[in-house]
Amino acid sequence: MIRMEEDFTNVDVLNADQLEVGDLIGIGGEIVKVLAIAPLHYGFNLAIENNFGEKDFVDVREDDTFKLYIENF
């Protein structure tokens, strides 16, 4: 089942250093799940998965912020 943005509620805004594995965050206009976090000298490398099951890596700076979402039931 494809989840749409209305299936989620924005509950907070997190700094990059507050992210945890399993968080649902907004990146690039979509809501993705954080699969892994690796520190870099300027920030973090995030392994992410979108709602189509596509996985990717994205580098973020330590001063970047992200909307945190929870699923609506």
Per-range role (PLM):
Residues I2-F8, K55-F73:
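Intrinsically disordered, low-complexity, charged/polar segments
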Residues I31-V60:
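Basic/aromatic-rich interaction segments and small domains that mediate binding to polyanionic partners
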Residues V21-G22, F44:
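Short, hydrophobic/aromatic-rich segments at coil-to-beta transitions
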Residues M1-E20:
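Mixed-charge, Lys/Arg-rich low-complexity intrinsically disordered regions
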Residues G22-I25, F66:
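Generic structural signal for buried aliphatic residues
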Residues A16, I37, N51, D63, ...:
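Generic structural motif
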